[in-house]
């Protein structure tokens, strides 16, 4: 009887820094019931990848789950596939760290009774030079999407076999994941998957269909718990697939013991198809979606899709400069601590991918994920003495000024308003300026909600869920024309209101906010100055900043004959206390964020007007819209009357 080989795999992951209740919910809704159901079907085989952050949580909170995994490995039902332990995008981290990350997860797999030889490529982000790192880590095969192969020129009917690929004389096997199976499982009735697998029968005993996708699809994604468990989809799937005489269930290692890869291919830099949309800048992403929709309307998409390519994963560092800066700080510290095992463990954690990008999940928009990355960067760097230096840290062609004292790291961008773009506390392991700017995203112009195909059978994938922006969010939606920092200098019309200011409906009279400042280093600090214009009249701003043991002191001198308000804005990463817009007068005020940056105090040498408002971004997630407080803006305001001098002190409490 003709049979088709079928490899079924899942990838289970929770980000570093995720909330404990999220981990608990995902465990109860997906990881635990999935494996307990698998235990009931001894003929069912699964290739599984668990990420390090999730395994650490399971080890500390649900150790019985590790016992179940050991039992399933021993019974031959599980093949463990590894990746970087803390789920980095391997292409985005130094080669030296890749091998350490993979070896660390291989060691965990050994403790479960399995010697792993395969890699689940995080977010399937492939670049050819990864071959050498993977082989150096003792990896024989890697799993990517069929889209990678089609981008290399292979047709769909050539994608039911693994292939070799090579770089620099090193060779590795690459398995293609079948995209059609990704959209069938588990969202459509089991019959649809079986029909598709049966249709692949053609007498070639080496032919293999591969499904390998997020384990969270089996219970965590909206609507899937009821469908997969309560309505019995998973039991039916395991029962029918494992007993079907026309389907030969296999593991990756079993396939490679019986068959050789089909030949040699060279894959381009790629990820899965959706990533090529998400990684584009917003306006280009909108055009990309329009183009895809036009091809679909003309029934040309399936035929020409292989030639439709958008951005690559590393584009996120262009799309989100805050992510780029965080990433380049991670690279900087990785290099500095390479010979310090304790410090290096922190930097390996900081390489967890989720906080660096954004697609259908929150990613870079989730403050608690960024906070976890910054915490580990700061803890790693605290093991080495950096000192003061001037260097292009984020590789944008413009120098940053890095200043360190006993308790803080401060990084200024003279070319961008002379502002303070990082103020990291060694004591608290927080970056006070971990604040994301408000951006227009291409999905803010949303289509009508999509519905499942196949006559409404099954449950919608999160890629199919249309979402309408609620009116109460639309009213508060605003976009920034600039990045957020501390000590940003504004010149405003005297009649400007708080609402105009916070909703970006005001006029910036000066060219100081993003203009270039000259600078000189002083003891424990920096002096910055700019000759510019306000309302087309000459103006000058000087600010002298000195780090102190509990924060910083800045002395301002402002000269302008224009009729204007001068404002100094401090954007602080207040995440756990939901603030409301407010206007008040004060000489001193306190900021208290108990589960975030903690308590700080801002003190002036005179009474001033203060504007406060939450910085809220709109992003999509698997559950709908997230209107997230990225931080709070505090702006102290003074009328300018020829010359203005004042002092501001920031104190960590």
UniProtKB/Swiss-Prot annotation:
It catalyses: Transfers a segment of a (1->4)-alpha-D-glucan to a new position in an acceptor, which may be glucose or a (1->4)-alpha-D-glucan. Disulfide bonds: none annotated. It comes from the Archaea. GO terms for molecular function: 4-alpha-glucanotransferase activity; carbohydrate binding. It holds the Pfam family AmyA-A_glucT_m. Coiled coil: none annotated. Its EC number is 2.4.1.25. GO terms for biological process: carbohydrate metabolic process. InterPro entries: A-amylase/a-glucTrfase_C, A-amylase/a-glucTrfase_central, Gal_mutarotase_sf_dom, GH-type_carb-bd, GH57_Enzymes, Glyco_hydro/deAcase_b/a-brl, Glyco_hydro_57/38_cen_sf, Glyco_hydro_57_N. The active site is at residues 123, 214. Belongs to the glycosyl hydrolase 57 family. This is 4-alpha-glucanotransferase. It comes from Thermococcus kodakarensis (strain ATCC BAA-918 / JCM 12380 / KOD1) (Pyrococcus kodakaraensis (strain KOD1)).
